[in-house]
């Protein structure tokens, strides 16, 4: 379960970076060259999704919970926004949903 969770976090980080770099280019007038590492990051994101040991629909559903938590960590660390009780509560609920889905893999 720990390996799967870490793989989910790595997958989410690649997706967030792959989307953040074009955002910097479009919203903050950053270099267009950021699109190159963004494309690489998104390709890595897709490849990482293929490493998960379950049906794709289950992967995407469980991944959503980890993505929420990773995005909130990004909000805190990169954007410098203090997380609220609502952020923490939502992340906990999303992560619980992910854990329930992952725990059910192979049991059906």
From Swiss-Prot:
User: Which Pfam families does the UniProt entry name for this protein?
Assistant: UPF0060
Q: Where is this protein localized, as stated in its record?
A: Cell inner membrane
Q: Kindly state which keywords UniProt assigns to this record, in alphabetical order.
A: Cell inner membrane, Cell membrane, Membrane, Transmembrane, Transmembrane helix
Periplasmic topological intervals: 1-5, 52-60, 106-108
Q: How does it sit in the membrane?
A: Multi-pass membrane protein
Protein origin, superkingdom: Bacteria
- Give the record's family classification: Belongs to the UPF0060 family.
Q: What is this protein called?
A: UPF0060 membrane protein YnfA
Q: Which organism is it from?
A: Shigella dysenteriae serotype 1 (strain Sd197)
Q: What is the lineage of its organism?
A: Bacteria, Pseudomonadati, Pseudomonadota, Gammaproteobacteria, Enterobacterales
Q: Which gene encodes it?
A: ynfA
């Amino acid at each position: 379960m720990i390996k799967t969770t870490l793989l989910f976090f790595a997958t989410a980080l690649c997706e967030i970076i792959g989307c953040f770099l074009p955002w910097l280019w479009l919203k903050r007038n950053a270099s267009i060259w950021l699109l190159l590492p963004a494309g690489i990051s998104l390709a890595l994101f897709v490849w990482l999704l293929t490493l998960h040991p379950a049906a794709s629909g289950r992967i995407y559903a469980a991944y959503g919970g980890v993505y929420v938590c990773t995005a909130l960590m990004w909000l805190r660390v990169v954007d410098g926004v203090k997380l609220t009780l609502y952020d923490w509560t939502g992340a906990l609920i999303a992560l619980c949903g992910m854990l329930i889905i992952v725990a059910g893999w192979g049991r059906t």
